[in-house]
Amino acid sequence: MAKTDTASFDSILVLDFGSQYNQLITRRIRDFGVYSELLPNTITAEEIKARHPKGIIFSGGPNSVYDDGAFRVDPEIFKLGLPILGICYGMQLMTYTLAGGKVESADNREYGKANIDVTSDSATLFKDTPAEQSVWMSHGDLVTQAPDGFDVVATSKNCPIAAIQDVDRKLYGIQFHAEVRNTDYGNDILRHFAFDVCQAEANWSMDDFIDMQIEKIRAEVGDKKVLLGLSGGVDSSVVGVLLHKAIGTQLTSIFVDHGLLRKGEADQVMASLEGKFGLNIIKVDAKDRFLSKLAGVSDPERKRKIIGNEFIQVFDEEATKLNGMEFLAQGTLYTDVIESGTSTAQTIKSHHNVGGLPEDMQFKLIEPLRTLFKDEARELGEKLGMPSDLVWRQPFPGPGLGIRVIGEITEDKLEIVRDSDFILRDEIKKAGLDREIWQYFTVLPGIKSVGVMGDGRTYDYTVGIRAVTSIDGMTADFARIPWDVLQKISVRIVNEVDHVNRIVYDVTSKPPSTIEWE
């Protein structure tokens, strides 16, 4: 029997202290089949107790425990008797809070790969892992004295206390980031915490998520009406099908053709969602309106905000025509939230689904995918019976091609990106790489260069190709596309797309870059 309340699952709570990786901790635990969610560090012991979790994880963070305004935790949490794992800042905070512990500024800061030595045969989290292993460090402070009752179980060259444990109280700390894939045995460490220490049961699944969200949506919406903004991407499409399953005709979807869509996208969206699933979709042609607002604007943040605001204004106008629309649904994902910044994390970039919303918005928000990563959203789509060609469409940002034209947006520039992106996707699919490469698209950097075509001099645009491999979009590496495939793509773009004479390939990972250029 499907579960419809989070209390029905064994869960591990992650407290947010500001690390850009904190969502990954939640994701890793969920990968084990254990429900997990990220909560503010201001949560009280009583609030945690009411949730009945199997354990707690303190995330990393940018603060020093000695900073004014540094994030703290309710000390009563340590009296709940629950297993706690502190990661990086989380370990330092645990040490700072408990008696006998000491944290100091490091003489030699560690950022990146480091080797640790596991010094105890009874190190619970390191069971069945090598005595020497590579981990991912990112810290300027370190623990110089473990709290009373703790044993030091791992060290590194620049960090004499790299891991600690108090088995009796089920308290554990690691100075490195087990959630990052650069830590060789990170999954093993987190798995030992979830199952050996917390004794959690793997009873969480996507089927449960669907049932839980449907019940939650019905309870929140009641008999009211919901307006959904379809962007043409995977996320909003999945939200549309999920909402339709939950509330049927109470959902009206607005598909705004803002002139920033990919080639043939508008027709594909209408055919897939209106035709197959029966969604009630109103298509709005707002191309001239959006391009007029964006004229002369080069700053990427301004472009995002303008596009977000225009979307809401269009929705407001359509809602007025429809009468009684109280809710606005969006396809916001976990990665959107973290990159837009939380109360603890710095903003990397504002997302259309998060940062572009005006303060006087007339709708109540519904974001059913807010706790999911991209691949989880795809899994959800498949579980809902959506066709694979729709579920596996390339990720597409809310602002569309507006952030793939670097600088000022014009119709001519959009056409270059639209046509070149179509060629890229076509050749990647022909090569059988469309499921191997996580995301791929073209971008117009706004650079012109000299070329020779037809024995004549040209001075035309450069098109950039961005292709990455990833699991969840939080970290990514550039895809190693075979040279012959890249050559075909390059030749076709230069020959078939007007005003282009040069192709470049982005070979940067995330971090330091983001996947999108803007």
From Swiss-Prot:
NCBIfam families: guaA_Cterm (TIGR00884), guaA_Nterm (TIGR00888), PRK00074.1 (NF000848)
EC class of the enzyme, as a word: ligase
Chain positions recorded as ATP binding sites: 231-237
Disulfide linkage: none
Name of the gene encoding the protein in the UniProt record: guaA
Catalytic activity: XMP + L-glutamine + ATP + H2O = GMP + L-glutamate + AMP + diphosphate + 2 H(+)
Top-level lineage group: Bacteria
Protein name listed in UniProt: GMP synthase [glutamine-hydrolyzing]
Limits of the Glutamine amidotransferase type-1 domain: 11-203
Listed pathway(s): Purine metabolism; GMP biosynthesis; GMP from XMP (L-Gln route): step 1/1
Keyword field: ATP-binding, Glutamine amidotransferase, GMP biosynthesis, Ligase, Nucleotide-binding, Purine biosynthesis
Quaternary data: Homodimer.
GMPS ATP-PPase domain location: 204-393
Entry keyword annotation includes Nucleotide-binding: yes
Pfam family, one: NAD_synthase
EC annotation from Swiss-Prot or TrEMBL: 6.3.5.2
Active-site residue numbers: 88 (nucleophile), 177, 179
Annotated function: Catalyzes the synthesis of GMP from XMP.
GO molecular function terms listed in the Swiss-Prot or TrEMBL record: ATP binding; GMP synthase activity
CDD domains assigned to the protein according to its UniProt record, in alphabetical order: GATase1_GMP_Synthase, GMP_synthase_C
GO cellular component terms, A-Z: cytosol
